[in-house]
Structure formats: structure tokens, C-alpha cells
Amino acid sequence: MTRPYAPGYRIPTDLLLKAYASGVFPMAESASDPEVFWVRPETRGIIPLDGFHTPKSLRKTIRKSLFDIRFDFDFEATIDGCAEKREERRSTWINAPIREAYVQLHRMGHCHSVEAWREDQLVGGLYGVSLGRVFFGESMFSKETDASKICLVHLVERLKARGFALLDTQFTTEHLKRFGAVDVPRGKYEKMLAEALKGEAIFFP
């Protein structure tokens, strides 16, 4: 992992979009740390859209229609859900400057959420950045079993339907590998990124 730029306390949206187009993204050491640093990993996590796999057990859950899936219905609640500390996740990298920057990107039409609702309560979701034909997944959360996983399935369905070419997960986890996530070297990723930035795909509406 490299940090190509000096830390800062604010992220201008024009700089943030240029960073994503260059294969760079911001993080913070913790939610309480006011500084932001920039990351350009040696290997990058992606989910090939044509290789996405929905586990059999999850397909059964999806058929039960337990959740109302909404897009961009309450973006700020979704990013706050991702930032919330939980028993299984005691720390988070979403600090105040990051939240502010992504809320602004959402207002500009470059950041979107997929949300799972149940009885008018937000119980899971994810958000990410849309640029060109690329969707950069940022974070997800669940308050009910499988809520964020089902949001991921709906995300991929929308990306395919809307003509997206690349789903960037930044890093891979065992959880994401169950859905087909793979690591690619930085050089290969940046070529894929450059190609996918050609043209425009509309995530919402």
C-alpha cells in the first residue's frame, strides 16, 4: 500500500474524482482521526461482472423478498450506517472529511447507495462512486443477516443492466471472494480502469 499524497483535513471533490480516475482513493486511520491519506494499492480488488457468483444459500434468501431494495433513497443514512461501530467492527475509516466529501459527490451525481429496508427501517446497504463505466465500491453494513449481501447482488444487476464495465472493491476479503472477487496487479488494474473510464454509464435514475 502506498500513500502518494500528503495527508489533509479536507477533500475537494474535483481532486477526489481525479484521484479515482488515477486509481487512488482516500482513507483515514480511524473515524476520530481528522486526517485523510491517499492509497494506491500494489494489488487491487475487483469483481468481474461476468464472473459474479451468488451463493446458493443467498439465492434462497433473495427469493423470500425479505427486504425492500432502494437506490439513493437515503444516502446519508447509508454512509452513516457504514461508519457506525458494531460489535464485529469496532473501528471504521469513515471520518468527518470523508463523509463530507462523499455526501457532496452524491449531490453531484457521482456517489450512490443501494439500501435494504424492512418495515421502513434501514437495515443494510452499501455505497460507492460512479465514474465513467466504473463503480468503486466503498463500504457496506448490515443490521440484519444477509442485508448487505443482497444489496451487492442488486448492485451487480444494475451495473450489468446499465452498461458498466468494472466493479472495483479496492481490496478483497474472504466475504467478497465468495462472490467472485479477485486481486489484480496495479498495472493491469490501471489499464482496465483507463478502458472502463471511456464512455459513460448512468447509475441513477
Curated annotation (Swiss-Prot):
Q: Cite the InterPro entries for this sequence.
A: Acyl_CoA_acyltransferase (IPR016181), Leu/Phe-tRNA_Trfase (IPR004616), Leu/Phe-tRNA_Trfase_C (IPR042203)
Q: Name one GO molecular function term.
A: leucyl-tRNA--protein transferase activity
Q: What is its main location?
A: cytoplasm
Keyword flag Transferase: yes
> Which Gene Ontology BP annotations are present?
protein catabolic process
Is Acyltransferase a UniProt keyword of this protein?
yes
GO cellular component terms, alphabetically, are:
cytoplasm
According to its UniProt record, the EC number is: 2.3.2.6
Detail the disulphide connectivity of this chain as listed in its UniProt entry: none
Q: What HAMAP family does the annotation carry?
A: Leu_Phe_trans
What protein does this entry describe? Answer: Leucyl/phenylalanyl-tRNA--protein transferase
**Gene symbol?**
aat
